[in-house]
């Protein structure tokens, strides 16, 4: 009876449903008429929804569908374009278009679906899909209008339509039917010019025997349930047997009438049927279901527990069955012939079991049969059955996957001999034993796919929420890459202090990580008792294919599966809790790693290897993570929401520059810049070079103690020494070190892990490797070290050495990375020798430390070495006479020898080195007729090797000498680049005793010298960089005995200004007994301007150096000079700013704007700007900028580039000159005109300067990089800051580099420069620098300057004639003009009014190329009595000395280019002359050479000023008349600078800049022009 009732109910249900199907087969026929439309209720397409219909047409254009938001931004439009369907849509005014590939105007029926998923919209035509994605600010679409098919009403206002022109689009012509919003049918609101059409796919009546036709997925389908027939067309008689129609009726297979027993699962919902009250025991059973999904892995159904269970799942797109009857699991995999089952199409699964035989079939075609183990035939189930996901899929017995299912399941039925469970129907009707967890939707909805993401760069990453796992958990994902290394996943817990056996604290954390290293996948786990590292792959997994990783943990144990290969693991210790905190990082780590504790065992993290490749289907504890959405929300840089592998090799286009090696990565090229001297993505940026002289070093101090088990180290070096420390890691607490040094011309790698301190049992001491030969050849060599645990590999150029460390201890501890000198010596028994040479491109675990230190990107860098490829002269010593010598301890060179030294001399002969020994053994090095001789005797008789230099070496230039002897008794002598080699047979050992004599012998020893030794006198000259077989002696302090005149440093024989006397455009100032160099405007210091000035590095966070003048000593200036050296990569920032007292508003600012340097200043009127427009300066190279101002006139010059000039315009001076010509006799016009010109009423004074701000932090325009040698109007502010001047405050990220450089004083010869103090200057100019390590001088800053005078507390603008009481802080009554710090000062009478002070110096006019015009008559005040005249270099004065002008300023054409060591236009200086172009106030249209600086004192009263004006003008005229009358015909009565003799014709050298006066006219030497060309000085 129950069967009958059930049948009646079924019949009624089907009948009512098929009644609605008749309506669905009625379509809409559109005729293509104007103003035709069919209007449906609004479709909610805001976030997620599907729309579908079927259509047929033979036209190529027409509007199919349209909706919008009422004329604002959003719309969706479907139309036909050239016979294909076009989808246009817009969200938040961002628009895109999708065009189908398939032609549809073929008069055939086509199925169309539009799928909305937030910013993504898909278009599917007959199963072929495309999608478009928008970068909109909001992830939803606003929909206001109803939905229109076939066209739109013409009566709608165009302004109410979002898409312009939609009303003008042609209407659709054809048939449409079966319009659905998801699975529901929308209500038709109205139509116009549209007919109902009964045709359609079912119009041909394909069903026989009364079967009812309906559409299923766009195809006609027959319902035969009421006919008694079966088959596709209801043509098969059911009574003929239990065929397919019988199965369809009894099992409700694919009937549309039973589609309501469908459920959608999104990963967290699941169904559970309770079997605990009625356990099932059966010998045979059957499971049937259908599924539809995009997902590759996921649980479909599970029943049973322990050893009795059935598990059905998707595994990598195939159907997996695992069944266990208690005797062992039977596993079966069914895979399709083409593609995968996760194609979002319906697939039918049937599992049958009869005793031990198990059969599984998919879609009735693909079938697999097998047998369970042993004789167990009963399946017992007394637990719950799960449909779809489960609460913990990873913990289910036999589950091959840990993912929950995402997709649709329908008609899930379990039956055996006794029971039939229609699980889908039971869930839908809410049966008591069927529990529903989550929001299960009982219809099939579109489930968003878990799109893959692509990490395009190693720096890319995304962060995931905290993983709440304690005792158990699971993670699964797929990855795909071609790169061998990368951190895939890391999460860790709170730091904990743990103590080892020696009570050494060590910060440890619980952590969980997955990494790809050398192509293999590793799982790392630490639960508090030590780290385990599990290798999960047998072959490399970086072949570009997808790999599925499934990790399941239960307490301490678990498994990791890669594809189908399982690897079990067990954590250390007893803890079963994994205590995690904070985010989980996927693909890499953030740049700011504050708070991150990186496990030592996680090598990819320590080596900075980020993952580059694709990841998809991330499930944590069975629940999916939409990582594409997370990446979008985090705006993750370098993460792309797609995954496709480029077919073309990236290196085929040869993207790497400078001979770098190109490697193909994942959709990218990788340029290996090692050994090129460059860095960057394509190795396009030149790496910084550090020069070391044996006393210099760079030390990187780690922000915290580092522990590593893997290191990548690479760098380039160049040296002439055979010994010296290159790079080493050092620890403050242990003897741990990884050290690379030169040892006998080879690179020695020593790794020492301090096993004793941590009480480990198996350590044999340091591991040592050697590679390379004769590397002290002054050529670049590349070193690379790779350590992975116990494995070591050292590569020097092409020489490779490998080794394996003995012992279990592999952890390296270090606090510092040191180069040049090892400063951390507490645990070092033998300190390595210091390095002399050059180092470049030091990379340690992915960080380029030299450039990071130079650019200020790290704050923990001690820098004593010097930037740039420099000629290194270390520790020079001068032997002033041939009788001078010293002795050192015996030379130790028994089995082998490496000697190196540098010398410079003008003598052709002399002893350099001598050491005698046992028997006849000796060694001697001497200079004979200008050539080096190496003489020795090892016991077989004396031998001599003579250098083969191209010319004699006594040319007063530095030369390098290398002498070596190896174990094979091969001797070589290398002088500069010339090498002579000789093999000596016989004795191989050199047994020396007694003292080693340097530069000479005691007087009585010359008569007893061995044969072949030619010298009978000592060496006169300079020795430097002496290396005695790895020992660097201090020739003076280490000497056992000294005789004669021996001084530290190297003084040359020249005492007059030469073209190479001053480097870097310094000005040579000739004195009677020598010369000095004015380095003010060079940014350098030292006696020869070749030592760097005080240098500060400003970091990323910004810094400020603020100098404040004392309140009673604030200067006001008419002219200013500013110079500074810098290197930076920022596009915008303020370098220096000088401000006047509050309320005045005067300022001067040097800044970088859009990468270009410029100056803006205001002296009381408007802002005046001058800028270098030609070339950006933020290229990371070292530049020197010079700025001069005289009134409103200004010049700006960068390096030796053309000078930029600014001259104001106006008519004031023209009017004044016209007045002069009318009122004053003609012959006095010119001097008075010049005087009036200077006193123009334009504002020219920079008033009451109060402070100098360096770094830009106070203005919010931060400067990052280095500043060096800042000079402003006599103040060397950076030197003052380094000496802790009380008027200077330093804030922020500002770091002094090296030590305070000394300031040159007045010397009478070219004396030894002070020690090479550290700076940060990038230059390609090779400059000789002589240095010492002792007797460092401190800089002395003079408070006076050439153009400053205190205005005390009197703050007034330039032209305000307001009484102001001057400060009494200065007692001098004369104007003091300092030519250079420590130099002479010229004094002139004090002028009480600023407007009546005559021009101190008038300069000739010049063009924009700074050439000189005919000179003008020069006016100056009388100099003080007793002032010594200063003559041009090389010029002798045979006449009586007359008072000379205070200062004469001439412009200096730039002499250096960055890529040249030659002068462009060497000039000879006049005594005390400046070399920097300055600016003079001048009349409009006439450009003049910049003049001298002026200092203004303000008058005490207006009355005094007026009286002074009258008196001074009368006095000047009288003096002028008297002078011209008295000296008119007397040549001998005045001194004229004879400039025709000032030129020194020496060729330009590499380290000097001199200044030469131009003649006013080529005819000035003629006698008849003599009187006209005189310069008169009063």
Curated annotation (Swiss-Prot):
Residues 1525-1578 are cytoplasmic. It is a single-pass type I membrane protein. Belongs to the neurexin family. SUPFAM superfamilies: Concanavalin A-like lectins/glucanases. The chain crosses the membrane at residues 1504-1524. One of its GO terms (molecular function) is calcium channel regulator activity. Brain. Residues 1-27 form the signal peptide. Residues 1337-1352 have a biased composition (Polar residues). PROSITE patterns: ASX_HYDROXYL, EGF_3, LAM_G_DOMAIN. Neuronal cell surface protein that may be involved in cell recognition and cell adhesion. May mediate intracellular signaling. Keywords: Calcium, Cell adhesion, Cell membrane, Cell projection, Disulfide bond, EGF-like domain, Glycoprotein, Heparan sulfate, Membrane, Metal-binding, Proteoglycan, Repeat, Signal, Synapse, Transmembrane, Transmembrane helix. Residues 28-202, 260-444, 451-643, 689-861, 875-1050, 1094-1294 form the Laminin G-like domain. Residues 1328-1352, 1546-1578 are annotated as: Disordered. Ca(2+) 3 binds at residues 1146, 1163, 1245, 1247. It comes from the Eukaryota. This is Neurexin-3. Disulfide bonds join 202-213, 207-222, 224-234, 408-444, 614-643, 651-662, 656-671, 673-683, 1022-1050, 1057-1068, 1062-1077, 1079-1089. Ca(2+) 1 binds at residues 308, 325, 378. Residues 28-1503 are extracellular. The laminin G-like domain 2 binds to NXPH1. Isoform 8/alpha-4B binds to alpha-dystroglycan. The cytoplasmic C-terminal region binds to CASK. Specific isoforms bind neuroligins NLGN1, NLGN2 and NLGN3. Interacts with CLSTN3. Ca(2+) 2 binds at residues 736, 753, 811. Residues 198-235, 647-684, 1053-1090 form the EGF-like domain.
